[in-house]
Amino acid sequence: MSFQILPIPMWVGTQDNYAYLLLCEETRQAAIVDPAEVNVVMPILKKKLKNKEIDLQAILTTHHHADHSGGNLNLKKEFPHVTIYGGSDQNGVSHVLQDKETLRIGNVQIEALHTPCHTRDSICFYAHSSNEHAVFTGDTLFNAGCGRFFEGTAAEMHIALNAVLSSLPNNTVIYPGHEYTKSNVKFASKHLQSEALNHLEGLCNHNQFIAGHITMGQEKQFNPFMRVTDPELQKHLGLNDPIKVMDELRTLKNQG
């Protein structure tokens, strides 16, 4: 069993969001993740449906913010049979997922991982088949960074990143909700020094889109928010409590 993931940059105006099309290769069943910009996503879906490349089954919503869920209702009008999954009954969500609840898109199993902090309804979708692993992290985890704690605490983000997501297989490919990698690398380099971070910086210099290039195993090597127990980072910040390290990193990142 295998699946394909098509990143769809929705870079409209100042936006830097991604939507993603997940396709089961055996059945052609598909799901679209966070299709906020209908004018970008709809032509792609219609073309693939017309060519019978996909059988659209679901919309997966990582959280309620409009730049992730804003296209749900318009897509539902166009594709009324589609189920909209998410963490709360906002913006057209018709199936509210419980933590660790699973659904299937063809032969691909998808597990809803509750990661409240950026929003209370934040969900990461872990997709896997017998030989492939991927996770759609919305605004919880970015390459070399994480989301703001709008509706949660440093302790909750610590759990989300360093208990929930870090426990996924190291070969799990990460698909974040935004392309923030270059700015995140710039911030991370102020607090960490590693060959892994240098490699990511080189990747940024040669690629406009980083989504789908990084695994969870790699992320844990260079993401400062996933290294809050690192003695060198703790020494650098003058803190030895991982949650306080998380909070301080987020405060510093918010300051620019």
Curated annotation (Swiss-Prot):
A Gene Ontology biological process term: methylglyoxal catabolic process to D-lactate via S-lactoyl-glutathione
Note on how the cofactor is bound: Binds 2 Zn(2+) ions per subunit.
SMART domains listed in its UniProt record: Lactamase_B
Cofactor: Zn(2+)
Molecular-function GO term, any one: metal ion binding
Binding locations of Zn(2+) 1: 63, 65, 118, 139
EC number: 3.1.2.6
Localisation: Cytoplasm; Nucleus
Stored Pfam families: HAGH_C, Lactamase_B
GO CC list: cytosol; nucleus
Catalytic reaction list: an S-(2-hydroxyacyl)glutathione + H2O = a 2-hydroxy carboxylate + glutathione + H(+); (R)-S-lactoylglutathione + H2O = (R)-lactate + glutathione + H(+)
InterPro entries: Clx_II_MBL, HAGH_C, Hydroxyacylglutathione_Hdrlase, Metallo-B-lactamas, RibonucZ/Hydroxyglut_hydro
Binding site for Zn(2+) 2: 67-68, 139, 178
Biological or metabolic pathway of the protein: Secondary metabolite metabolism; methylglyoxal degradation; (R)-lactate from methylglyoxal: step 2/2
Principal location listed in the UniProt entry: cytoplasm
Keywords, comma-separated and alphabetical: Cytoplasm, Hydrolase, Metal-binding, Nucleus, Zinc
Residues binding substrate, per UniProt: 148-150, 178-180, 250-253
Family: Belongs to the metallo-beta-lactamase superfamily. Glyoxalase II family.
Function (record text): Thiolesterase that catalyzes the hydrolysis of S-D-lactoylglutathione to form glutathione and D-lactic acid. Involved in the metabolism of methylglyoxal, a toxic compound for yeast proliferation, by converting methylglyoxal to lactate via S-D-lactoylglutathione by sequential enzyme reactions catalyzed by glyoxalase I and glyoxalase II.
Protein known as: Probable hydroxyacylglutathione hydrolase SPCC13B11.03c
Species this protein is from: Schizosaccharomyces pombe (strain 972 / ATCC 24843) (Fission yeast)
Lineage: Eukaryota, Fungi, Dikarya, Ascomycota, Taphrinomycotina
